[in-house]
Amino acid sequence: MSPLAARQSPSETSAFFQVVDAFDDGFSYAYSPSIILKDGTYHVFFCSEGGGNYPSWDAIRYTTSTDGETWSRPKVVLQATAKNGEDMAACDPSLVFYQGFYYLYYTSALTTASKTYQGVIQVARSVSIDGPYLTFTQRRTWENTPTDPNVLIYPLEMHCAQPSGYGAGQQSVIVQNGQLLMWYTDDSVFVSGQPQVKTYMLQSSDPVAWAPEGTHATNLVNQASIDVKFDLSQSQFMMIRVENEFSSTSYLARSYSSDGMSWTAPQAVYPSGQFPQYAHDAGIAGDEIGNVASPSALVGFGVPYGLADADNWGHWDLYAGYVDPP
């Protein structure tokens, strides 16, 4: 069991349960899940500590459950090589099925100067949801842990000095009307010399060809790490996010949009006091093309070990609950 500090009160945590015990499973953290409900099984891909033969910061692990209560032991499905100052991480997964393949979009990073990095978006794919996942390369091949992964999306502006900001990443991808839609974070266009977090929306019919532009910014500002699904019952896009993340007043909220560009103000699903403290990086269950699970959807998020009442950076379990529970 994860080492615990003082636990949060039952009123804040009774609706939530552990999906991944990072400490027991041999790594330091678990967060930012991409969740697909397929044929009665939850498939959860999440960001976790890198390891093995590769010195990358992060790796993507995978766990499953048929009841939302008992979960398989997580296994690594995607690693980065950190070769030549590139491909520094495999994090923030977003999985979608398109034209016969499961495409696993993920955030990596590259070195722009000494101890200076920016996030970028890359992709791997598989014919089966449980892998193996092969990464798209600069040679336009698909290979296992290549040293030359192809960067699909760079930050709008590259920075070779501090502050460099986060870069581009934290993507959320769905399929709508035969097209791939992506929302992602980019803070590289500075305001008054400082990074400003914006969310951008892109569309493509080619999984490895995207065209970022500053004109594709949504009305979301300072709303990093979102997860978007399509709500068939309302014929609208739905966004889920932990507001006030990494704080004692964190809460779960959602927004709606008819076009994916203009979003309503976030409304609390679980307000502060009814949601775990210091939570962050949520993902909500949907089908394999990104329609939100109905009538009740599993939502996962990172939180301090065992719901500890402390901001223990980098020591996170993956917890979950249900939006619109029966």
Predicted regions and their residues:
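Iron-sulfur cluster-binding cysteine motifs and their immediate structural context
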Residues: D281-G283
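Polysaccharide-binding and catalytic clefts of secreted carbohydrate-active enzymes
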Residues: Q171
